[in-house]
Amino acid sequence: MNRSEKAAIIEQLKARAEGASIAVVTDFKGMSVEELTRLRVKLRENGAEYHVVKNTLARIAFTDGAHDVIKDVFKENCAVALGFADPVAVAKAVTDFAKTSKIFTVRHGSLEGKFLSGEQVSDLAKLPSKPELIARALGTMNAVPTNFVSLFANIIRGLLYALKGIEEKKAAA
């Protein structure tokens, strides 16, 4: 690989990393092409990409960027998953794949510029996804007016039953 090819790889990876909300560094040593392809498909379904790049090029690409906190973890056989949509979905995809593979491990990550250990990436994967959190928040906000309307309707219904009882009592007398 000549110098211009290396520079192109660095620029491409740097540009992709700048647009990513999460970057997860993994160890892929000993994985087959079939396993890597399955991982890439799973990540693509969750709005992410998986890049196997030389460590030196990755260190240069991640210097002075949104995810520069992970530039020093590129050692031995590393690859990086870059997530552009929901960071939780990417963390889940990588963590789930690590559970099914004996070789694949999650090393570190970066979420919006904050360093994450492999354990923290696994913890992030346990959280509900962004759409689930939005649905829960909307459900909670919707519950307050619904409960208020139900309470108000019960008060009015009780008043009507009381008035109906008084009316029946007067009609019987």
Swiss-Prot record:
Signal peptide: none annotated. Part of the ribosomal stalk of the 50S ribosomal subunit. The N-terminus interacts with L11 and the large rRNA to form the base of the stalk. The C-terminus forms an elongated spine to which L12 dimers bind in a sequential fashion forming a multimeric L10(L12)X complex. NCBIfam families: PRK00099.1-1. GO terms for biological process: translation. Forms part of the ribosomal stalk, playing a central role in the interaction of the ribosome with GTP-bound translation factors. Belongs to the universal ribosomal protein uL10 family. InterPro entries: Ribosomal_uL10, Ribosomal_uL10-like_sf, Ribosomal_uL10_bac, Ribosomal_uL10_bac_type, Ribosomal_uL10_CS_bac. It comes from the Bacteria. The keyword Transmembrane does not apply. Keywords: Ribonucleoprotein, Ribosomal protein, RNA-binding, rRNA-binding. It holds the Pfam family Ribosomal_L10. PROSITE patterns: RIBOSOMAL_L10. The lineage of its organism: Bacteria, Pseudomonadati, Thermodesulfobacteriota, Desulfovibrionia, Desulfovibrionales. GO terms for molecular function: large ribosomal subunit rRNA binding; structural constituent of ribosome. GO terms for cellular component: large ribosomal subunit. It comes from Nitratidesulfovibrio vulgaris (strain DSM 19637 / Miyazaki F). This is Large ribosomal subunit protein uL10. Gene3D superfamilies: 3.30.70.1730, 6.10.250.290.
